[in-house]
Amino acid sequence: MSARRNFEWPELLTADGRGIAFGGDYNPDQWSEDIWDDDIRLMKQAGVNTVALAIFSWDRIQPTEDRWDFGWLDRIIDKLGNAGIVVDLASATATAPLWLYESHPEVLPRDKYGHPVNAGSRQSWSPTSPVFKEYALTLCRKLAERYGTNPYVTAWHMGNEYGWNNREDYSDNALEAFRAWCRRKYGTIDALNQAWGTTFWGQEMNGFDEVLIPRFMGADSMVNPGQKLDFERFGNDMLLDFYKAERDAIAEICPDKPFTTNFMVSTDQCCMDYAAWAKEVNFVSNDHYFHEGESHLDELACSDALMDSLALGKPWYVMEHSTSAVQWKPLNTRKRKGETVRDSLAHVAMGADAINFFQWRASAFGAEAFHSAMVPHAGEDTKLFRQVCELGASLHTLADAGVQGTELAHSDTAILFSAESEWATRSQTLPSMKLNHWHDVRDWYRAFLDAGSRADIVPLAYDWSSYKTVVLPTVLILSAADTQRLADFAAAGGRVVVGYATGLIDEHFHTWLGGYPGAGDGLLRSMLGVRGEEFNILGAEAEGEPGEIRLSSADDSAALDGTTTRLWQNDVNVTGEHAQVLATYAGEEADEWELDGTAAVTRNPYGSGEAYFVGCDLDVADLTKLVRAYLAASSQENADVLHTVRASADATFDFYLPRGKKTVELQGIEGEPVILFQTDREEKPGSYTVRRNGVLVVRR
C-alpha cells in the first residue's frame, strides 16, 4: 500500500502566499481575446485570486498531431499573473481532440453492449488504452516543460472528474487489463474461482485468459456479483493509475508544485474509492452540486464531512460548485437570495480553504450554456454578480481574520462510509434493489443534526478508534478484519450502531453464514446479541400487501412508538443473555408478515462498550427519535442551526448557519463577530438574529 503524499497547499500571489483561494474554472478559449481584459477587470472587482485553466483545451493546445500552439495560453497566464491571479493548470486530458479519435478509434471506451462510446462529450477515452496514454502523457510533459517554472502556475489540476464518462469500460483493452489485474490480485486461477464462486452456474475458469468482463449477457441475466464487484474495483484502479501516470509525468519535470484532481462527492455522486485517491494528491479537491429542497444545507454538510475526513482534517478545496442553477437535471432550480454566499461560507465552515465555481463566465454555446456562472449571460449589472462580489469580500475578511489553515473540530460520532458497499448495493442479486448506502449515510447524518448533534463521515478503511460512537448504515461488505476492529472498539468502551443490511457479505460478495448479520464468522452476531434467519422486504408488489410496518417501544422511553419501516425488516431472535429489546414490530401489518413482537431495535453490552442493532429502515424523522433517545441524549446544540468550529493554536472560529426557512435567534454567543451575512447583531451582548440563508461567524 502506497504512502500518502505530503500535504501541500498552493500559494497565492499575496505578500505571504496565504489567503482563501477564490475563483472558478476559466475557459478563455471559448471567447475572443478582446474579452480577456474585461474578464480580468471583473475578476479583480470580485476579489478573484485563482482560476483553474485549460481543463478542456487539448485541441487548442495541440490542433493537429504535429502542431502545438501555446501562444494563447502564454498570453492569458501572463495577464492573470500580472493581475495577481494564480493558475491551477489542468493537464487538459479530460477531452481529447477529434483528430486523435479519427486517427485512433481504438482509444474509445465501449459500453456493456459492445458499442463504442463516441467522441463529442467528455472523457471519451479508455483509461486502459496504451495509445491514448502515450498521447496524454506527451501532452503532460509538454505542459510541464513550458509552465513548470512559471511563477503564476502554482498547482496542477490533473484530468477532470475522473470516471464521469468512462467509469466502466468494456473494450478489449479493458478486458486484457482486467485479466492482468485479476492475476495480480489473486495469483492463481483457483484463488479467483474461489473468490468469484464460479461453481455456481458453471463459470469455472481454467486460466486467466478465460476471465471475462461483465458485458451484456441478455436482458434477464444477472452478473456474477463477485465478478461485478471486482470489475468496480478494477475500474477505480485503472482510472487512479491513469491519474498517477499523468501526475508522475509532470512531476518528473516539475516536482515542486502540488497536484490535485477534483473528486465528485455530492447528492447522488460518490462513485470512486476516494479513500484510496486521497492518498495520491497533495491537497483534496471536490466538485459539489447542491440538492434542492429542505435538506439543501444538510446534504452539503454531509458531503463536506466526508471531504474533511478524506483530507485528514487538513484544509481542502472546493474546485467546483454553482452560483445558481445547473443545466443537467430534468428541472433545474435556481438558488434563492443569499444561497450563493451561504453555500460557499458553509463549505468554509466545514473545512474548505478554497471556493471555486464552475465557471467564471457563462458559456454562450454548448452543452452547459445554461449552467450558472460567476458572470451570468446578463453581465455584471446583476444580482448574481453582486453576490459573487459580496462573497469575495467575505472570504477576504475571513482570511484576514485568520481562518485559513484552521481545522474543523470533530464530533465524537463517526458515520462510516464504504465505497465498496456503495458499489455492492447496486447489485441485481440482493433481496432489494432499493438499497443505497450513500443515501442512508446522509439520512443518518441529517438525523444527528435534527437531534441537536453533528457526526463526522469517515471512510471505513480509516482509523476511527478515537470516536465514542460509530454508525454503520447499510455497510453491506464487512471483512473479518473490519469486524474484528468493530469488536475491539466496542470491547474497549465504544458504542457500535449497526444498521439493517450491514455485514451480510464479505469482500468477495460471499454471504456470511450461520445467520444474519454474520460478518466475521458470526463475530458481529455475537457482538449484537441477535441472530437473523430471514429478511422481510416490503414493496407492495402484490396487491393488498402492507406498504409499511409500525414499531412499538419495548422500554420505558416510548421513544420509538409510532415509527415505521417501509423497505427492509430483519426477522431476528435475541440471543444475547443481557441484550435489551428497545422496539418491536407491532400491529396488523406486522402480524400479516408474522413479525408482531419480533425485535426491531436492540442494545447489547459488549466488553466495556455496547452494540445497537437497528434491524429495519427508518426515515430521517424516525432515525432522529432513535438518535435523540439513545445516541445523543446529552446534546445541547440548537437543532435549527448548523454549528461548526474551526480552530488553531491562535484562534477559534464558530460558524452558525440556520438549517431551515425560519429566522433564528441566537443568544450567549461568545466572541467578536467576523461575518454578519443576513444577520443582525442585537443590543444584548452575544445576541444575534440570523435570517434565512444567513451566516454568523465569530472569533474567540
From Swiss-Prot:
Top EC class for this record: hydrolase
Active site residues according to the UniProt entry: 161, 320
Post-translational modification: The N-terminus is blocked.
Binding site for substrate: 122, 160, 328, 368-371
Keyword Magnesium in record: no
Catalysed reaction, written as an equation: Hydrolysis of terminal non-reducing beta-D-galactose residues in beta-D-galactosides
Domain of life: Bacteria
Biological process according to GO: carbohydrate metabolic process
EC annotation from Swiss-Prot or TrEMBL: 3.2.1.23
GO CC annotations on file: beta-galactosidase complex
UniProt keywords, alphabetically: Glycosidase, Hydrolase
Activity modulation: Inhibited by high substrate concentrations (100 mg/ml). No effect on activity with various EDTA concentrations (0-1 mM). 20-fold higher activity when cells grown on TOS than when cells grown on galactose, glucose and lactose.
Temperature dependence: Optimum temperature is 50 degrees Celsius using PNPG as substrate. Optimum temperature is 35 degrees Celsius using TOS as substrate. Stable at 40 degrees Celsius. Half-life time at 50 degrees Celsius is 10 minutes.
Entry annotated with the keyword Hydrolase: yes
Molecular functions (GO terms): beta-galactosidase activity
Pfam families (UniProt xref): Glyco_hydro_42, Glyco_hydro_42M
Biophysicochemical property: pH dependence: Optimum is pH 6.0 using PNPG or TOS as substrate. Not active below pH 5.
Function recorded in the entry: Involved in the hydrolysis of transgalactooligosaccharides (TOS). Highly active towards Gal(beta1-4)Gal and Gal(beta1-4)-Gal-containing oligosaccharides. Low activity towards Gal(beta1-3)Gal, lactose and Gal(beta1-3)GalOMe. No activity towards Gal(beta1-6)Gal, Gal(beta1-4)Man, Gal(alpha1-4)Gal, Gal(alpha1-3)Gal(beta1-4)Gal, lactulose, 3'fucosyllactose, lacto-N-fucopentaose I, lacto-N-fucopentaose II, cellobiose, maltose or sucrose.
Oligomer status and interactors: Trimer. Tetramer.
Family per similarity comment: Belongs to the glycosyl hydrolase 42 family.
PANTHER family: BETA-GALACTOSIDASE GANA (PTHR36447:SF1)
Protein name, entry field: Beta-galactosidase BgaB
Organism: Bifidobacterium adolescentis (strain ATCC 15703 / DSM 20083 / NCTC 11814 / E194a)
